[in-house]
């Protein structure tokens, strides 16, 4: 490809164009180029490939190679009619911009609240009105949010304190100490973590402060005679500023009380009384120097509902609803609902007016982004720099909104209404993501609910008659795992060599197109297969998939028997069909003239391809030869084309692809005996659901330490039925009776070898597992059938050599598994007496079952999919590269060049500790991280001895012979050899050297020496240069 000029679209955010990817047309074409192409298509309606290629060269200056343009045109030509139309071209450009959008490719697969809620506290005696978490503050001012306690308050003045794991710690009662007939009615509470105090605002016009150090709950101070009851409290503490307690009362009056953070005991009490009483007027007048109170007056029209302090702007926010008792004529008037007041600059205030007022809000000071919710159930988004009108509104709640918070840099809004229904919103797209209603079905409808968002654990806690919690987009613990690729087990993993992308399908009904070189999601198809059950739309698990012969379309099969054809680049469904209602599809194949699908219907169903290539008439059932469900199948495209199918009972049937006629039949329990090819005469009923998908579920924790063999009776062995889990054709091998071309894996861990020739049959078998209870579930090979890759139920990946001639030394350098060990591992011991095939590699790639394998020959990469929802990339030698969909990034992989040895390989976090020695050796590339105790003690001893020599070594001594005897120092011929001491880790060389004292050497006149050297005559052979040394200079 040659690049003549670099063009960028006007207003494009891309500063430079990637010259190595000519298929990204949206990065090359300008707006004028697109308009020119539009006019050209209006005139010609459609373009041939050569015409489009010439036009793109004229517009962009990009010279495509034949292979590059063929791939590009196949991506554009979705109709597959060898003509390019305008809608196809513009759709391809739009998809290119969509793939470049970083927010589009980072779309989360899970819903924000995907896990079930958990019950923290059961039914409470008194409903909870306030939940708050208090961190632990050290004496030096260090705040530790991972250690703290929970505090729950009730209106009946009962305060409960709980540990971080919600175990009860203590209970306090905020009753009045005066003899009053009326009981205390709490309006709001606040924890003062840095002072170890608890503040209570009650309906008795009082503010009570309690000491909560240790197990006590002691009343210390009472601020009484407050003009109006305080309804809202918000406490803020920081090491850089004074601690502040913001208060809002029933009339909309706001006040701020400041404390001195440098004093550990801000309250000085009277020695004659255990409780200090202070009137509110004395607090305002400054009679109590430990606290300073500032009254900002009535800034809001009604009861203050929520408060928040913003430290960067040194201001606070407050909101209130409109007065419901106001006259009807004044209700239409807009009152101030939200205020942003600076603490010191009283004239610096921002007012926001909302109809009916505001009950709650969420504010992001970094983006100046404010979201408000009120009794009308509508969410309004504001830019506080322009508070006149909201930026946007979100409607969806059927009741008043009482709580909300922001998440992920103000990208998501969580809002809860009075009916305890939580809704999650996408701020950028302004759409509803999820509606979560489990809280409303668990809590009492008549009891108001309070909420608290724990930013540390990303957890929403809701309290009423119970205390419940639900994780909200929980963070991935990178020290334990790299994340997940799907939300449920992965069933299909395919590599498309045309587009050089990876496609995965899972039981979550997701189809994801991956750019595995950069760990990016290119396309996400959600709810690919669905069905309506009891009026609800439910997802259907995807169990099989394949590409069309041109590698442009994707065919998927689901558990309900439906088949769908997808354009995986655009995510559009192009056709749909079904083999039988309720029959799981276990294998699909797309041939040039037909589509073959099979599953629990016991037969192969053929859908002929219509004239247009996208219409599929009614399916035709082949001859029924299986007595049970078909579990897997494989196709060979070497002439003559054949297909092999196997059932749950171990039956293997070979079919001719062209005619659909069976020509061989075997049983895995007795592979040497050929079974006559006869049609099934018994009527097959409706298929029943089996536990076939158990490989995708969490497996048992097998604890067998060594492989054991159970000897069964001969009669029982003959009656045993063996299930075949996977079939694989070796297509590069010739069709010959003595050449093995089909591999079948049994549930005993044995792989059988068959020849699909008419005169062929069972040729042999070999053991492919080394753990008791394990079995091979997935298999794949390279195009030349040199390597065989097997994935087992326990998560092990093995690489086998299928060639008889090989270079053993070269393979040992390539595979660390082949290095000699002092004690061979179980994988090597299991194949010690098994000559062929040769085991090249064995390591644990996943903790759970490996459901699919895919090998990329160009880069020599092996990709494994597991029931643990992950897709991992491995090198041919077994080194771990990364996990698709993980937030952990790795260096970009070249799509056409094998990965270099200097690549920064890692070890999966879940495999760093509990793995076998063989797996650890493979994951480390042959480097041994374990040292013997004797070797460690020897190195420590040498280190101590060497450090002593280096630190306290003897100084250099003068030579014994005086310098006057030999004025020119020692001659080289008389210097004795130094005896070095090599017992240390570092040899002290200077201790054994004899160094001449240069300070007493005779100083030579250099000018005189140069003159004498110039006068030397070397013309005679008798003259020697040594004569100079014999003269007296």
Curated annotation (Swiss-Prot):
Domain of life: Eukaryota
InterPro entries xrefs: G-protein_beta_WD-40_rep, WD-EF-hand_domain, WD40/YVTN_repeat-like_dom_sf, WD40_repeat_CS, WD40_repeat_dom_sf, WD40_rpt
Annotated WD repeat ranges: 54-96, 132-172, 181-220, 353-392, 396-435, 485-524, 537-578, 625-667, 719-764, 771-810, 845-884
Keywords, in A-Z order: Repeat, WD repeat
Protein name: WD repeat-containing protein on Y chromosome
